């Protein structure tokens, strides 16, 4: 009998630790499935806005310096860049930072096609590796096309009002859960893991959860 581990990953698309966390989660899932052939995973992504009042197209580096302070940002940069590189991510801090709501809408939309994980990966790449604007509709539609979705359909969706109320509801639900930092993982609807945990740590968590189920 197959056992299922359901993971809801709460993320924001401009959070570097969410990108790092996704790579670690992917690796942990692959490793656990390889060692446990009777286990399958259902991974979905839920929205979180680190700053729901952010204006669009603010200078990315300047915004981080304003948030953390220039001295702290400069001290953090080598460490997080090195950590990201260890996960195969070429982290960059050029370009602009914008509100992430539309990127979350597109991720929500992609779920009906089974493309959420791939699209999250592609949107993170466009923002962190290519210095593109996460609120730019053309860039988001290109990301959708890159994972096998129809660009014109993605663009039509983003420019419409579809998914707005649904994503707002998901954001409210996460607020009710008292989630104040991401990434945050909800496992089998009753366990939670906070932060971009190492893959080995996540594998241990999966084992512990299955032993309780």
Functional labels for PLM-detected ranges:
Residues 3-10, 14, 20-37, 41, ...:
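C-terminal cap of thioredoxin/glutaredoxin-like
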Residues 16-17, 70:
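A short SAM/SAH-binding and catalytic strip from SAM-dependent methyltransferases
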Residues 23-127:
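Structural alpha/beta surface segment adjacent to cysteine/selenocysteine redox centers
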């Amino acid at each position: 009998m197959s056992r299922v581990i359901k993971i809801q990953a709460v993320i924001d698309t401009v959070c570097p630790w969410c990108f790092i966390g996704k790579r670690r989660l992917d690796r942990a899932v692959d490793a656990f499935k390889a060692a446990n052939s009777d286990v399958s995973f259902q991974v979905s992504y839920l929205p979180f806005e680190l700053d729901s009042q952010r204006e669009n197209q603010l200078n990315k580096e300047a915004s981080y310096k304003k948030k953390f302070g220039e001295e702290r940002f400069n001290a953090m940069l080598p460490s997080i860049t090195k950590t990201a590189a260890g996960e195969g991510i070429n982290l960059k801090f050029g370009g602009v930072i914008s509100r992430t709501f539309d990127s979350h809408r597109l991720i929500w939309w992609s779920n009906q096609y089974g493309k959420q994980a791939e699209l999250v990966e592609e949107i993170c790449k466009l923002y962190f590796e290519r210095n593109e604007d996460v609120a730019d509709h053309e860039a988001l539609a290109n990301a959708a096309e890159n994972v096998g979705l129809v660009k014109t359909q993605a663009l039509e969706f983003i420019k419409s009002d579809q998914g707005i109320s649904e994503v707002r509801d998901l954001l409210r639900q996460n607020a009710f859960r008292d989630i104040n930092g991401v990434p945050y993982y909800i496992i089998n609807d009753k366990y939670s893991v906070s932060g971009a945990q190492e893959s080995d740590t996540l594998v241990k968590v999966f084992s512990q959860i299955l032993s309780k189920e």
